[in-house]
Amino acid sequence: MSQKKSLDNDCFALPKGTYWTPVDIALQHLKSNLNSVVGVERIEVSQGLHRILSKPAFARQNSPPYANSAVDGYGFAKSQMSKKRRLRILPGQAAAGRPFQNAIPKDFAIKVLTGACLPDGVDTVVLQEEVTVQENYFILESDLRKGANTRPVAEDVRKKELVLGLGHVLRAQDLALLTSAGVFEVEVFVVLNIGVFSTGDELVNTIGAPEKQLDKGTIYDSNRPMILSLFRKWGQHIHDLGILPDNINET
């Protein structure tokens, strides 16, 4: 079987001994040789959507800042519970924003709502649907582990921990993460002003001119809408400069 002969007119053929630079190597060259040409500014996190961090953001507080209940139920000290597993319910409750001020003694329980700060003496919460209350007590029938249905301090983020790194493009969920970590301002790169245009007498504009028909030898300008959208996605100020003809004087 004869070997397949390479085409002499292959547009991708390179001179013998010459090779394409792999994409990852090309990107490394760009990153090591290019520098930022824009300034930086400090903005409120609430205004940070699509902005690019010019400095890493570190947590200024734990998130959550205190141990809290993940469910509505009854809080008690599993680590100190007696074998009878009979828990007397104290009057009152712990709610989000309204903590219960007193410590919970051994073999007692307190009503807790989702998000409530766990009172002193509480290390476990049982779902309210899993208990049958009789007068002012209940029997714990489920075999809960210590810490069940609770969220410990710093479960999401620990104080001084890196939250988001240099160059991160801020998303909506990132704004919530930063805020919960006590970060209310961030340093970002100044937004770029970018002009985008296409060149070529063969191009037909479709932006603002839908259903425009093609003449022989022409094609729709498809790259410009794509590039404009990419820059908008990255939060930059975009100026659509349309299509420039193949004429150096007009260009």
Which functions belong to the PLM regions below?
Residues M1-K83:
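Short, low-complexity N-terminal leaders and the immediately following helix N-cap/first helix
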Residues S2-T18, Y74-D240:
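Short, glycine/charged-enriched hinge/interface segments at domain edges or termini
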Residues D240-I248:
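Short beta->alpha junction loops
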Residues T251:
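Catalytic cores of alpha/beta
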